[in-house]
A protein has these predicted regions:
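C-terminal non-catalytic regions of proteins with extracellular/luminal or membrane-system context
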Residues: 1-65, 89-106, 114, 121, ...
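Intrinsically disordered or highly flexible coil/loop and linker segments, enriched in small
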Residues: 78, 125-132, 165-169
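Short coil/turn segments at secondary-structure boundaries
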Residues: 84-85, 130-136, 171-174
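Conserved short secondary-structure transition element at the edge of the structured enzyme core
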Residues: 32, 65-76, 120-125
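Mobile "lid/hinge" segments at catalytic clefts and subdomain interfaces of large enzymes
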Residues: 73-82, 86-89
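Conserved, charged catalytic cores of large soluble enzymes
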Residues: 117, 124-139
Length: 479
């Protein structure tokens, strides 16, 4: 899929005078040069229909919708993404006429034939059409077989990354069922993003990990959630507050072998303070100046004192480039700040009991708030792998995963990195001296050093190697 973005240089100026990503022939030729020969789809809204001021039209504002369609096919598009809301089949048919008038019917037909071929091949390769009637019992026997379950378990084990282990876990198999304290974690439910808008969400208390799954491996001690005592929500029922919990006492925790805290990685999105509410609901903006909140990869509030100013990106529809810099602005505490508070309580009450954090992540995060409070840290991607974490604690499986993102030393380190250069960030270093860099991970023997880490230790790319973008642009400009 192509993009909406305008190609810009490091100062935010249009790069090469070319069309936006949706129409940029150099972006498409990148795929051609590396041997890609399959379906190419555009992002939504790049031909019109979502308003003439949408970002997808950059560089083609003066063209009609059929002219944009023709240009898209000419540049390499196979599918017009989300086209149902645009000018309909009439605009597409007229787009073909524009294309045929420009390059001739024979070449225009070849382009559309290739687009249809790529689409049909991809759809047929899914295998959904040759036999639409399947035996569900037979399918279940394959999907839920012992072999499939074993494969899934092995894959989950391999995906978990251990980034800290202060000698707590040795891989020695446990012969008895340990006792573990698992605290509940609080989330405000707040979210904000450009597509869905601002949502205050529904506050909740949930166990950090699946207690039913953990019960197969441990004797579990946990907290008690009381009745919700907050203000009424849209459904008329009271919302949960941070006070609607009774934590396990020091006496209850004292007999535990481990404290296990399940957490979601810290992340607050950047958004415009005048962003409308989710699903079109009204939002009172009285007294709110318009500005951008900083993104944040830490749980606590973050003031972006070292952020870029002016911003690289910014709306240019009105002729002048908008400055979206959030320098000096403050990101609120993460909606999951209560996850950090659960860890803080666990660390305070644990005494000599080892504290293990199991963190589910979708990106990097700043570890200064978390790492000093833990004896062991496991990282899972996208979702908690409760079974895998439990097996590793019990010595039934060995962690073998590697970090797929650099983990920043600080928010300032994030601001200091170059936006389009990979692996150029100052990474977090923990109390043991280990640096949470790309491809870092630990097993029972210590820091992993194998063929994978040697391969991934190559110097990061600082220029495109498979396609010399700059020379192509110079040639095009000269012509």
């Amino acid at each position: 899929m192509t993009e909406y973005a305008i190609n810009v240089d490091k100062d935010g100026n249009p790069f090469g005078g070319e069309y936006a990503g949706a129409y940029n022939e150099f972006m498409y030729s990148l795929l051609d040069e590396v041997g890609y020969d399959s379906l190419k789809i555009t992002d939504w809204g790049v031909f019109g229909g979502l308003g003439e001021k949408t970002g997808g039209l950059w560089g083609t504002e003066s063209l009609s919708e059929p002219e944009r369609v023709a240009l898209g096919f000419e540049r390499g598009v196979n599918i017009l993404g989300g086209y149902g809301g645009y000018g309909g089949i009439g605009a597409i048919a007229e787009g073909y006429n524009v294309l045929a008038g420009r390059i001739g019917e024979e070449e225009a037909n070849a382009i559309l034939t290739k687009a249809a071929y790529n689409y049909i091949v991809v759809m047929m390769n899914l295998g959904m059409f040759e036999q639409p009637y399947n035996d569900s019992a037979y399918a279940d026997s394959i999907i839920f077989s012992q072999d499939a379950n074993a494969f899934g378990q092995e894959t989950q084990d391999k995906s978990v990354v251990m980034i800290k282990n202060d000698g707590v876990l040795t891989g020695e198999a446990k012969t008895e069922k340990p006792k573990v304290y698992v605290p509940y974690v609080y989330s405000t439910g707040f979210s904000a993003n450009w597509m869905m808008g601002v949502s205050e969400g529904t506050p909740s208390w949930t166990p950090g990990l699946d207690l039913d799954v953990l019960g197969k491996y441990f004797d579990v001690v946990t907290d008690t959630v009381g009745a919700a005592t907050g203000e009424a929500g849209a459904d008329g029922n009271p919302k949960f507050t941070k006070d609607d919990i009774t934590r396990a006492t020091a006496e209850e925790i004292a007999g535990c072998d481990y404290v296990l805290v399940g957490m979601t990685g810290a992340y607050s999105a950047s958004y415009n303070s005048h962003l409308q509410a989710a699903f079109g609901a009204p939002r009172d903006l009285t007294g709110i100046d318009e500005f951008y909140y900083p993104p944040s990869l830490q749980y606590a509030e973050y003031t972006a004192d070292t952020a870029r100013d002016p911003s690289i990106s910014g709306n240019t529809v009105d002729g002048a480039k908008e400055n979206r810099s959030y320098k000096g602005k403050t990101a609120p505490a993460d909606a999951n700040y209560g996850h950090l508070e659960a860890l803080q309580y666990a660390n305070e009450i644990a005494g000599d009991i080892p504290v293990i954090a199991a963190v589910s992540m979708e990106r990097g995060m700043v570890w200064t708030e978390v790492e000093p409070l833990c004896d062991v840290i496991f990282v899972s991607y996208n979702a908690q792998k409760t079974d895998a974490i439990a097996r590793m604690i019990l010595g039934q499986a060995e962690p073998n995963g590697l970090l797929v993102f650099q983990q920043p030393a600080s928010m300032e380190a994030i601001d200091a990195q170059v936006d389009d250069v990979p692996r150029d960030m100052e990474c977090y270093k923990d109390a043991a001296g280990n640096t949470y860099d790309f491809a870092f991970g630990m097993n029972w023997s210590g820091v992993i050093d194998d063929a994978r880490t040697q391969k991934y230790s190559a110097a990061p790319l600082t220029k495109v190697q498979s396609h010399d973008f700059g020379d192509k642009l110079k040639t095009a400009a000269a012509e």
